[in-house]
Design a protein with these regions (language model features):
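PAPS-dependent sulfotransferase catalytic domain
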Residues: 101-104, 109-126, 130, 144-309
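Short coil/turn segments at secondary-structure boundaries
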Residues: 2, 6-7, 152-153, 313
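Short, flexible loop/turn segments with low-complexity composition
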Residues: 45-49, 260-264, 311-313
Length: 313
C-alpha cells in the first residue's frame, strides 16, 4: 500500500469513527494520516514565519495608501480569504447566490504574481506591474462570468497577498472569514487536501502556521481600508445569518436580494472538500466541534490556551 492509499485509509477510518462517536479512535487515525502527509510534503514553519515578517515589513500603511494611484478602478473582484475550512466556501455560496455575482471558485492567480512581486522588492510596486496583474485578472474573471457585476475568488491562501491585491484593485472587496482556530485546525486535520499542497495539517506545525496567519491578517486589518477589508466571524454567520449577510452584500456594493439567505439553492459548482455542506441550509453543527476531541488535541490545545482564542459555546 503506497502513501496515498494509506492516507485515504486513515482518513476514511477516522471519519467512520467520528460518525460513530468514537473520538479517541478517530483522532488516532487522523493523527496517522497527518504523519503520512508530513512524510511526503514537509512544511517549514520557520521559513513561513520569515516570509510573514517580510510581507508585514514591505506592506506599510504608506504603500497601501498609494493604491488609488497604482491600481485599477474596477470593483469586480470579491476575494474571500482565510484559513482553509474556515467557511470560505459557504461565503462564496452566499455571495454568488446574488443574481449579479458569478462564482469563480479557487483561482490560482495571485500566488504566482505574489511570489514575483514579493521577491522583486521595490520594483514590484511600480504601476506597470499592478496594471498588468489587474488586466490579466480581469480577463480571467470575465471568462468565468462575462456579465456579472462581481465575481468571487475563494482561494483561501490569498490572505498572503491581500496587500498586492489591494494595490492592483483598490475598489475590490476582500472578505476575511474567521472561525474559531481549534475548530478550523481540527477540520483541517480531518480533511484530505491535494497531495502537492505544502500545507501543515496537524501538530505544532499547524499551530505555528496559524500564528503567522493571524499576525499577517492582523496587519491587513491595520493597513487596509475598513470598507475594503471586511471580516466575518463564522460563528456569527451561522448564529444570526441575515444581518451578517446583509452587511456582506452591502460591502460588495450590491442591492439586497433574498436569494442570499438560501445558499443551498445556489446551483453553482463547488469543487472543494466543503461540497456536501454547501448543499445544506446554514447550520451550526460545526461550531465547537473541538470539544468532542478535547482530551486528544495534543499541540492544537495551545490554540485555546494562547490567550487570543475565544472558546465558542
Amino acid at each position: 500500500m503506497d502513501a496515498a492509499q494509506r492516507l485515504r485509509l486513515h482518513l476514511a477510518i477516522g471519519k467512520a469513527a467520528d460518525d460513530l462517536g468514537d473520538y479517541a479512535l478517530a483522532m488516532q487515525h487522523f493523527d496517522a494520516a497527518d504523519w503520512v502527509r508530513r512524510s511526503s510534503t514537509p512544511f517549514d514553519p520557520a521559513a513561513f514565519a520569515i516570509e510573514t515578517d517580510s510581507l508585514i515589513a514591505s506592506c506599510t500603511p504608506e504603500l497601501m495608501a498609494c493604491a488609488p494611484q497604482l491600481g485599477s478602478s474596477d470593483a469586480t473582484p470579491v476575494l474571500i480569504i482565510g484559513m482553509p475550512r474556515s467557511g470560505t466556501t459557504l461565503l462564496q455560496q452566499i455571495v454568488s447566490s446574488h443574481p449579479e455575482v458569478g462564482a469563480g471558485g479557487e483561482l490560482n492567480f495571485w500566488n504566482d504574481r505574489g511570489a514575483v512581486w514579493h521577491s522583486s522588492g521595490a520594483a514590484g510596486i511600480e504601476k506597470p506591474f499592478q496594471a498588468k496583474a489587474a488586466a490579466d485578472y480581469l480577463r480571467v474573471l470575465r471568462a468565468i462570468a462575462p456579465r456579472a457585476a462581481r465575481v468571487t475568488d475563494k482561494m483561501p491562501f490569498n490572505f498572503l497577498w491581500a496587500g498586492l491585491i489591494h494595490l492592483a484593485f483598490p475598489r475590490a472587496t476582500l472578505i476575511h472569514c474567521r472561525r474559531n482556530a481549534v475548530d478550523t485546525a481540527l477540520s483541517i486535520h480531518q480533511t484530505q487536501f491535494h497531495p502537492t499542497l505544502a500545507f501543515p495539517t496537524g501538530g505544532a506545525e499547524l499551530v505555528a502556521y496559524f500564528r503567522s496567519y493571524r499576525r499577517l491578517t492582523d496587519h491587513w486589518r491595520k493597513v487596509l481600508p475598513a470598507d475594503r477589508f471586511i471580516e466575518v466571524e463564522y460563528e456569527d454567520l451561522t448564529r444570526t445569518p441575515e444581518p451578517v449577510i446583509r452587511r456582506i452584500i452591502a460591502a460588495c456594493g450590491l442591492e439586497w436580494n433574498d436569494a442570499c439567505l438560501r445558499p443551498e439553492r445556489n446551483p453553482g459548482a463547488v469543487k472543494t472538500p466543503s461540497k456536501w455542506q454547501t448543499r445544506q441550509p446554514i447550520y451550526r453543527n460545526s461550531v465547537a466541534r473541538w470539544r468532542r476531541y478535547e482530551p486528544w488535541l495534543g499541540p492544537l490545545r495551545s490554540l485555546v490556551e494562547d490567550g487570543r482564542e475565544k472558546s465558542p459555546t
